[in-house]
Amino acid sequence: MPYLKRVLLLLVTGLFMSLFAVTATASAQTGGSFFDPFNGYNSGFWQKADGYSNGNMFNCTWRANNVSMTSLGEMRLALTSPAYNKFDCGENRSVQTYGYGLYEVRMKPAKNTGIVSSFFTYTGPTDGTPWDEIDIEFLGKDTTKVQFNYYTNGAGNHEKIVDLGFDAANAYHTYAFDWQPNSIKWYVDGQLKHTATNQIPTTPGKIMMNLWNGTGVDEWLGSYNGVNPLYAHYDWVRYTKK
C-alpha cells in the first residue's frame, strides 16, 4: 500500500475509533434498567432536593424532610407550611441520567387547586446541557385529567391534556412514557393515550418526581388556597432501557 494511502487509512481509522469511544462513554454514563418498589430510601440512587426554591412560578422551598417513606411501602412527597404564607415542598430525583427507554410510575397525585404532582425527566443549563424534559403532570385542580408535555432545547408548548375517566387522586394507577429517537408515547394503565413525533428531546436526563404549589400561574393551575399538608404518593418506579 502506498505510504500516503496508509497514512490516510490510519487517520480515518483513528477518527472512527475516537468517535466510537466518545459514543460508548456517553452511553456508559447513562443509567441502566431498574425497578424500585420504594420499600426503603436508596440514598445512593436518589437525591432529595433541599434548602432552595426554583423561584418564578414555584411558591415553595424544597425540603428533604418533605420526601419520606411510609410503612405502606411507598414514597410520599409533602406540601407543608412552616409559617404563615410560607410553604415547603418535596422533590426526589435520580443520581444518574437516563436516555431512551420506557419510564413507568405507579402513583396517586395530590388533589387541591393551585398545585402540581409530577413524574418526569429533566436536564438543563445547571447540568451543562440543553433544557430537555418529558413530563407527566397532574394539576391538582382537576385530577380526573393528566397533562403530558415535553421540551427540546428549551422549546415547549407541547401540552396535551387527557381525560382519564377516573379520579387519579383516589387510587393508584400506572403512568408511563416510551422515549425513542423519533417519538414519545404516553400510556395510562398500559393504554396508549398520546404520541408526539416532532422535535423529540435527545439529551439524557434525571428521573424526577415533585409536588409544589404555584404562584402567578392561576390560569394554568388555579389559585392556591393555602390548604396543607397535601401529599402525593409513589408506589414504585421502573425504567427499561431500550
UniProtKB/Swiss-Prot annotation:
- The record lists the organism as Bacillus subtilis (strain 168)
What's this protein's name? Beta-glucanase
Q: Which InterPro entries match?
A: Beta-glucanase/XTH, Beta_glucanase, ConA-like_dom_sf, GH16, GH16_AS
Q: Which residues form the GH16 domain?
A: 29-242
Please give the family membership noted in the entry.
Answer: Belongs to the glycosyl hydrolase 16 family.
Residue pairs linked by disulfide bridges in the UniProt entry: 60-89
Uppermost EC category: hydrolase
Active site as annotated: 133, 137
CDD domains under this entry?
Answer: GH16_lichenase
Which superkingdom, per the lineage? Bacteria
| Alphabetically ordered keywords of this record | Disulfide bond, Glycosidase, Hydrolase, Pyrrolidone carboxylic acid, Secreted, Signal
Carrying Pyrrolidone carboxylic acid, the residues are 29
A GO CC term assigned to this protein in UniProt = extracellular region
Q: In which compartments does the protein localize?
A: Secreted
Q: What extra comment accompanies this record?
A: Beta-glucanases of Bacillus have a substrate range similar to lichenase of germinating barley. The sequence of strain 168 is shown.
